[in-house]
Amino acid sequence: MLRVAIAGASGYTGFELVRLLDRHPHAELKMITSRVHRGQRLDKVYPALRKHCDLVFEEPDPERLAAEADLVFTALPHRAAMDMIPDLLKGGAKVVDLSADYRFLDAAVYEAWYEPHKTPELLKEAVYGLPELHREEIRNARLVGNPGCYPTSVILAAAPLVAGKLADPRTLIADSKSGVSGAGRGVSLTVHFCEVNDGFKAYKVGEHRHTPEIEQELSRLAGEKLAVTFTPHLVPMSRGILSTVYATVIQGVTPEDISAAYESFYRNARFVRLCRAEMPTTLQVRGSNYCDIGWRLDSRTGRAVLIAVIDNLTRGASGQAICNMNIMCGFPEDCGLQDAPWQP
């Protein structure tokens, strides 16, 4: 049985990790940490977990975490993760990091969007944890940077078109809508009920921190440096992301060419479902690790319209983290993740 721990288990992604690990046949949760809730039982903070987990939150001590667990999920804020992860690795634990600290190939890119990086040498070995693109590298990794929620949806939507050279990658535009849980469990005016309910707004236009992740991975697929226009929006629902990606196709590309590219690219993808007849909705992936993708070619404008939906807490965070754990530890990729989505 694989021993696992969660550093920073009190947020929504921490809850989702516990919920999913509870049904995992080969992993046992041994330790959870939280400075704020230290000494409290998890099921007091999250009553939904009564009779599922009675662990008590402990102080985040990397030496103890590495001793108690073979693999640690770090569900910590940016910068806090990099304070802990080097010690976890030294202690022999594998790490799946849900912060942005180890998602980038280049420390300068991280520092341009976040803060100075304390351990840039670890970026050389960290693997970007999107299984559809980097499955073999993940298999041999001891440190995986779990992708952000928006990048997961945008990259998966655009990857076959970019990799197949069917569109001009310099024309990529991504428009994404997210549920409020993407902002985390903390209290702020931005996610106050009266500020969100009955409203729909764009935010961080032209400056969202997920932009460089999208650009990094699509640039790798394109073989050239790309700049992507990315605009996120907040919608009044609890969970879910719908991303619409636009790209101008190469002259002569047909709808059949696009369909063939998606079928080929995702032929072995356990958690990508292609919607051939209809456009996907966030409801059909709720609570699951699926990314559902639909597409159309607008022949009038020569643009491909690509639509991807995910659950931001599952495929966009904790479900993908467990999928990465499975790959790193030699388990079937869908272990603990086989449940159908919730509906309604």
From Swiss-Prot:
EC number: 1.2.1.38
GO CC terms in record: cytoplasm
Active-site residues, as the UniProt record annotates them: 149
Top-level enzyme category: oxidoreductase
Signal sequence extent: none
PROSITE patterns: ARGC
Compartments, as annotated in UniProt: Cytoplasm
InterPro entries: AGPR_AS, AGPR_type-1, NAD(P)-bd_dom_sf, NAGSA_dehydrogenase, Semialdehyde_DH_NAD-bd
Key words of the record: Amino-acid biosynthesis, Arginine biosynthesis, Cytoplasm, NADP, Oxidoreductase
Function: Catalyzes the NADPH-dependent reduction of N-acetyl-5-glutamyl phosphate to yield N-acetyl-L-glutamate 5-semialdehyde.
Stated name of the protein: N-acetyl-gamma-glutamyl-phosphate reductase
Species of provenance: Syntrophobacter fumaroxidans (strain DSM 10017 / MPOB)
